[in-house]
């Protein structure tokens, strides 16, 4: 195989149990987001926009929709050997050594595929999660990794100390070399010179290739290990004196974007997913999809334009402060502060507000829907209300989150 300078490996096998029922039939990275994308698209665009084109995507849990999405819509062609995005399912590649086991953790997923790293002989390996919403110039992080002569560089997100108890926290010296890793500490240690802020690990790493091999081979031999980068590999690297540095995500430059890079969301719960979706519909969104210098590619399904019809009395087709994909028809209804995916139809006299409707949802006449996530292929009968009586919603079998968001599962029949 052809040699590459930087090899990307994306961890996309997560079950995403806290996103159920959205993950009932799909992996977390395959969950739709932002009217036309899937969550995996954002990290893939980060690699491609950063000029890193040799990418493996490691899959495991309910990967069919994710597999189809990448195979159909993320193709470079067959003429450049160092340009590829290839899927790597869990396949017991080390069966003779490990026995009949799938990926046992984030580190083990890479360990079971070290032969792929060996084949390309990269200078550095970028190991990123496939389930976050963010923009990142990964090439800038790689250059920082080279400049510091690091064995490992960890992307870090500054958070208020009061919020840092939810994260793995990195303690650094004045050079931003990591001296300690705290897993969800009760008393997080602040950044030097910034007593109100702590450094949270984003779970994205750049490894010197030789260090990656050494650490993963040692971890695989450790029978007490959970084979996780944050819990096992990074603490081992610190104990054994590896050069481990933090990279300040806020200083990551995005072409076409002014100011610091502030937006990173782990949409690992239904409420977090909903909040990130609502971020998109603000007049000045926290996460801007409209940056021609940082294009966000995804499936091109050749949908027709969105359409708004009727303008008589209360029967007015309109959408306010919303994102609508191709093929949406708002026929005499009102959509407000919502995200509508492909081929959604909102019929006359209905109101949809602060909601997310996946592909092929149809809202009948005189419906009222608020604070809801409705998965694909749901036909809502006329005069139905969702999000107004939470006990009724629970009785229907819908999920109601701690923040009161109602989630209707894929293909639900009223």
From Swiss-Prot:
Cross-referenced SUPFAM superfamilies: Nucleotide-diphospho-sugar transferases, Trimeric LpxA-like enzymes
Enzyme class of the recorded protein, top EC level: transferase
Residues annotated as binding alpha-D-glucose 1-phosphate: 103, 168, 183-184, 201
GO molecular function: ATP binding; glucose-1-phosphate adenylyltransferase activity
Keywords: ATP-binding, Carbohydrate metabolism, Glycogen biosynthesis, Glycogen metabolism, Nucleotide-binding, Nucleotidyltransferase, Transferase
Xref: Pfam families: Hexapep_GlmU (PF24894), NTP_transferase (PF00483)
One Gene Ontology biological process: glycogen biosynthetic process
InterPro entries: ADP-Glc_PPase (IPR011831), ADP_Glu_pyroP_CS (IPR005836), GlgC_bac (IPR023049), GlmU/GlgC-like_hexapep (IPR056818), NTP_transferase_dom (IPR005835), Nucleotide-diphossugar_trans (IPR029044), Trimer_LpxA-like_sf (IPR011004)
Functional description taken from the UniProt entry: Involved in the biosynthesis of ADP-glucose, a building block required for the elongation reactions to produce glycogen. Catalyzes the reaction between ATP and alpha-D-glucose 1-phosphate (G1P) to produce pyrophosphate and ADP-Glc.
Family according to the record: Belongs to the bacterial/plant glucose-1-phosphate adenylyltransferase family.
Protein name, entry field: Glucose-1-phosphate adenylyltransferase
Organism field: Thermus thermophilus (strain ATCC 27634 / DSM 579 / HB8)
